[in-house]
């Protein structure tokens, strides 16, 4: 088994990644596969923090355009990430992986409230820590939450799991000649307006020197390849 090149990671999983081909909700087979891939990392000695999106269940920004108050919509979106977190924790427990679910705001009886020192303690004990409810504030995306939590727990890298192989110069779904980048600087991403994350999340990572790797989680085994240093996806640093 190859040695991991990272000691502690923050894995960002989009809600869409959990829905598979369903178009909505959670595909149990995808969830179980992701849990087993995370288990492999734990067995390699890697400390894993996870941030989940909620777009498979609810999109606050979309309803805000239809007239709903943005703050209300974002609160609903945060609760969607908690639902995804509960599903992920359950999948990890079924895979015999110790996991702790934390929420950015209080949800007594459902999960723990986010506590930095407790999260660090859990990570050191090789428990997967799932950070839900985004940053706890409206107007911030779950990508911002991923970068924030990654910086807070002093992760070596933020791994953004997507449905494409990395960062392209244009949309690969629309353009057959789209070029995949292996490596980029923060400045290149901003100059070329490449779609990696929203600007608030991305500049937070840049200002704190947090590297980001965008890779395709749909490919089985891709997560392990990233961890062992195989050229997978796009690294931004």
From Swiss-Prot:
Any one biological process term the GO annotation gives: 'de novo' CTP biosynthetic process
Top enzyme category: transferase
Catalytic reaction annotation: UMP + ATP = UDP + ADP
Protein residues bound to UMP: 54, 74, 135-142
Pathway membership: Pyrimidine metabolism; CTP biosynthesis via de novo pathway; UDP from UMP (UMPK route): step 1/1
GO MF annotation list: ATP binding; UMP kinase activity
Reported regulation of activity: Allosterically activated by GTP. Inhibited by UTP.
InterPro entries referenced in this protein's UniProt entry, alphabetically: AceGlu_kinase-like_sf, Asp/Glu/Uridylate_kinase, Uridylate_kinase, Uridylate_kinase_bac
Keywords: Allosteric enzyme, ATP-binding, Cytoplasm, Kinase, Nucleotide-binding, Pyrimidine biosynthesis, Transferase
Main location: cytoplasm
Compartment(s): Cytoplasm
Pfam families documented for this protein: AA_kinase
EC numbers: 2.7.4.22
GO cellular-component term (any): cytosol
Key word ATP-binding present: yes
Residues reported in the UniProt entry to bind ATP: 12-15, 55, 59, 162, 168, 171
Involved in allosteric activation by GTP, as annotated region: 20-25
HAMAP family: PyrH_B
NCBIfam families assigned to the protein according to its UniProt record, in alphabetical order: pyrH_bact
SUBUNIT field: Homohexamer.
Family: Belongs to the UMP kinase family.
Function, as annotated: Catalyzes the reversible phosphorylation of UMP to UDP.
Protein name (database record): Uridylate kinase
Organism of this sequence: Actinobacillus pleuropneumoniae serotype 5b (strain L20)
Lineage of the species this protein comes from: Bacteria, Pseudomonadati, Pseudomonadota, Gammaproteobacteria, Pasteurellales
């Amino acid at each position: 088994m190859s040695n991991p090149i990272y000691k502690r990671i923050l894995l960002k999983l989009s809600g869409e990644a959990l829905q598979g081909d369903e178009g909505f909700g959670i595909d149990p087979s995808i969830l179980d596969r992701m849990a087993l891939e995370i288990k492999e990392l734990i067995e390699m000695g890697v400390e894993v923090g996870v941030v989940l999106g909620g777009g498979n269940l609810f999109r606050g920004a979309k309803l805000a355009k239809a007239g709903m108050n943005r703050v209300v919509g974002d609160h609903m979106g945060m609760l969607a990430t908690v639902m995804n977190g509960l599903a992920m924790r359950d999948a990890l427990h079924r895979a015999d992986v110790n996991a702790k679910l934390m929420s950015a705001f209080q949800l007594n009886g459902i999960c723990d409230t986010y506590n930095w020192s407790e999260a660090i303690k859990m990570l050191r004990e090789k428990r997967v820590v799932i950070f839900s409810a985004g940053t706890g504030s409206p107007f911030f995306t779950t990508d911002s939450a991923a970068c924030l939590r990654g910086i807070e727990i002093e992760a070596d890298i933020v791994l953004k799991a997507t449905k494409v192989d990395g960062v392209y110069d244009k949309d690969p779904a629309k353009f057959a000649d789209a070029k995949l980048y292996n490596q980029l600087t923060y400045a290149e991403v901003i100059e070329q307006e490449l779609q990696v994350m929203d600007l608030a999340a991305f500049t937070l990572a840049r200002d704190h020197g947090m590297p980001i790797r965008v890779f395709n989680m749909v490919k089985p085994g891709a997560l392990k390849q990233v961890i062992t240093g195989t050229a997978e996806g796009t690294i931004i640093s």
